[in-house]
Structures are given as structure tokens and as C-alpha cells.
């Protein structure tokens, strides 16, 4: 069992969730309530990672984050190291690749809030910011939780993006999915099976726990 790869995968998943949690709330609410020109285009761009093969998407991110790109050069100047083939590069790539898994469920959660509830909040004089925290977010929280669970579970199993942007550097970019692939390549099916089983157990436990929490939140709101 490659515990280093598992720990790195968990760190990557937690960092991705931490970045996308506030982003999914703000972007999901904006897309749910907004009525503006170009909304369909923005939604299509958010959903783009779902239809592109991970290796293709990873290739374009590799080009965008490379040393000769504006983003890569700026990162090199600010932090003194390359963005590609680093853990930080994996986090950035994972955040971009998981945008649809984070934003779409949150958006659906906000869209499910009755218009009458939002109108009542406005009638009571709540500012948009207070309405978000006092009314919208508690009602949309099951959707937000679903978004974070999907993001966490999807990040744990990411392969194509990780391989293209981060490679397989032990202790830096070698995630559990890459470690499983390496074991299969070495015909170590027992080792690969053990790591795959651990990954399934973590994902199942996360989903089960979140379903239980969502049910509790739903009963309280009811």
C-alpha cells in the first residue's frame, strides 16, 4: 500500500474542495438568479470539462501552465518554481477540471428555492449578502454538499489530468490513481487491488456520510 500517494491524493482532494466551496456558492447563486446575455455561453464553458477527454483537457492545461506561457512565467517569477509537475499545479488543474462537478449541483440547489421565499427576504429588508447567509444558503445547502462530495470523490480518482499536468513524481504529484496504474504496469495486481479497494472504501464512506448529513439538514429545514 502506497500511503504517501494516498495522503497526497487526500490533500489534493481537500485543497480542491476548499477552493471550490466558496466559488461554487457564489457562482452557483449568480448563475441561478442571473438573467444576462451570455449566460448560456458561461454555463457551456463551465461544463466543458465534462465532454473533453481528461488527457485532451490536461494537454491544454499543460500548454497553458508551461514555462513559456504567460501563466507559467508569472508563477515562476512569483514563486521561483514551475507550475507544471508540481503539487500546486495539480491543485490549479484539479480546480479547473472539477468546476462542473462543483458549480452545477450548487446552481440547481439555488434554483430549487421558491421565488416567494426570495421575495419575502427582500420584502423584509435583507441585503443580498444577508439573504445569502440567512435564507439562500441554508435552503441550497444539500445541493452545495452534493457538489463538494462529487468534487472530493472525483478528485480522488483523477488520472488523465494528473498524469498530463503533474506526471508521476513520488511525494509531489504521484497520486493514488497513478500509483494503481504503476502497479498494474508492473503486474502487481495484488498491490493495485489493495489500493483500489481503499479508494472505493473512502469514496463510499464519504458519500454515505454526506447522504446522512443531507438527510439531517433536510429534516431540520422541514
Show where each model-derived region lies:
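C-terminal transmembrane helix and the adjacent membrane-cytosol boundary/short C-terminal tail
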Residues: 38, 100, 107-118, 122-126, ...
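Interhelical loop and adjacent transmembrane-helix boundary motif
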Residues: 1-4, 165-204, 208
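Non-cytoplasmic
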Residues: 66-67, 147-181
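Transmembrane alpha-helices
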Residues: 18, 101-106, 110, 114, ...
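Membrane-helix interface segments
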Residues: 34-42, 70-71, 85-86, 128-129, ...
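Periplasmic/extracellular loop-to-transmembrane helix junction in inner-membrane transport proteins
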Residues: 1-18, 30-39, 69, 75-80, ...
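Membrane-interfacial helix termini and adjacent extracytoplasmic/periplasmic loops
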Residues: 58-95, 165-170
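Transmembrane-helix boundary motif in ABC transporter permease subunits
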Residues: 15-46, 59-61, 109-111, 115-117, ...
Amino acid at each position: 500500500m502506497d500511503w504517501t500517494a494516498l495522503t497526497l491524493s487526500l490533500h489534493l482532494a481537500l485543497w480542491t474542495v476548499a477552493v471550490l466551496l466558496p466559488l461554487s456558492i457564489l457562482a452557483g447563486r449568480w448563475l441561478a438568479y442571473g438573467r444576462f446575455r451570455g449566460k448560456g455561453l458561461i454555463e457551456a464553458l463551465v461544463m466543458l470539462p465534462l465532454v473533453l477527454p481528461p488527457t485532451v483537457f490536461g494537454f491544454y492545461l499543460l500548454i497553458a501552465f508551461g514555462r513559456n506561457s504567460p501563466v507559467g512565467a508569472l508563477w515562476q517569477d512569483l514563486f521561483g518554481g514551475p507550475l507544471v509537475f508540481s503539487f500546486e499545479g495539480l491543485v490549479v488543474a484539479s480546480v479547473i477540471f472539477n468546476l462542473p462537478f462543483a458549480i452545477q449541483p450548487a446552481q440547481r440547489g439555488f434554483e430549487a428555492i421558491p421565488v416567494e421565499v426570495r421575495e419575502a427576504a427582500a420584502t423584509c429588508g435583507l441585503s443580498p449578502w444577508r439573504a445569502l447567509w440567512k435564507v439562500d444558503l441554508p435552503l441550497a445547502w444539500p445541493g452545495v454538499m452534493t457538489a463538494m462530495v462529487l468534487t472530493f470523490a472525483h478528485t480522488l480518482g483523477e488520472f488523465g489530468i494528473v498524469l498530463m499536468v503533474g506526471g508521476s513524481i513520488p511525494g509531489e504529484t504521484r497520486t493514488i490513481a497513478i500509483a494503481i496504474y504503476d502497479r498494474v504496469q508492473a503486474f502487481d495486481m495484488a498491490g493495485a487491488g489493495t489500493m483500489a479497494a481503499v479508494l472505493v472504501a473512502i469514496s463510499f464512506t464519504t458519500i454515505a456520510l454526506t447522504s446522512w448529513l443531507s438527510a439531517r439538514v433536510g429534516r431540520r429545514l422541514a
